[in-house]
């Protein structure tokens, strides 16, 4: 039997499992979250929308967690509590509530929803999704370079034998 999802507490980070990425929000109580909503997170835009990669603005929204998650699974994930001390809960919520309704800068690689919630909870803007993609791309690039080098060496060796 699967363990039940723990009830979020104010100030908790909520990780929402979209089909191709993770969306992040911060729980502020009474069923509500505050999150950064680029066009891909606007109702009807489609969960797999690439619109967030094409925009530089997002709206800070306060919505019911149930509505933001929709049919996607979610979990409480305060994953950096071991590295950073969370700010006091009252400060997290105050900062989040003050931003609701504001249009803010949005960059997929440096100012996305994960950066936003980590800044609110820890005072440190970071995104592991971005880091993981950069690492994967670097590893893939090195692999392709190594394969190309092996191919060149193999073809030279083959020509020398002829």
Curated annotation (Swiss-Prot):
Topological domains, Lumenal: 155-162
Induction: By IFNG and IRF1.
Lyase found in the keyword field: no
Keywords for the protein's UniProt record, in alphabetical order: Cell membrane, Cytoplasm, Disease variant, Endoplasmic reticulum, Host-virus interaction, Hydrolase, Lipid degradation, Lipid metabolism, Lysosome, Membrane, Mitochondrion, Nucleus, Peroxisome, Transferase, Transmembrane, Transmembrane helix
Compartments it resides in: Cell membrane; Cytoplasm; Cytoplasm, Cytosol; Cytoplasm, Perinuclear region
Disulfide bridges in this chain: none
Catalysed reaction, written as an equation: a 1,2-diacyl-sn-glycero-3-phosphocholine + H2O = a 1-acyl-sn-glycero-3-phosphocholine + a fatty acid + H(+); a 1,2-diacyl-sn-glycero-3-phosphocholine + H2O = a 2-acyl-sn-glycero-3-phosphocholine + a fatty acid + H(+); 1,2-dihexadecanoyl-sn-glycero-3-phosphocholine + H2O = 1-hexadecanoyl-sn-glycero-3-phosphocholine + hexadecanoate + H(+); 1,2-dihexadecanoyl-sn-glycero-3-phosphocholine + H2O = 2-hexadecanoyl-sn-glycero-3-phosphocholine + hexadecanoate + H(+)
Activity profile over pH: Optimum pH is 9.
InterPro entries for this protein: H-rev107_PLA/AT, LRAT_dom
GO MF annotation terms: acyltransferase activity; lipid binding; N-acyltransferase activity; phospholipase A1 activity; phospholipase A2 activity
Transmembrane segments: 134-154
UniProt effect for mutating residue 23 to A: No effect on PPP2R1A-binding
Domain notes: The C-terminal transmembrane domain is required for the targeting of the protein to damaged organelles.
Associated pathology: Lipodystrophy, familial partial, 9: An autosomal recessive form of partial lipodystrophy, a disorder characterized by abnormal subcutaneous fat distribution. FPLD9 patients are lean and show muscular hypertrophy, insulin-resistant diabetes with hyperinsulinemia, hypertriglyceridemia with low high-density lipoprotein (HDL) cholesterol, liver steatosis, and polycystic ovary syndrome with hirsutism. Some patients have more generalized lipoatrophy, whereas others have abnormal fat accumulation in the face and neck regions and show cushingoid or acromegalic facial features.
UniProt record similarity statement: Belongs to the H-rev107 family.
Name of this chain's protein: Phospholipase A and acyltransferase 3
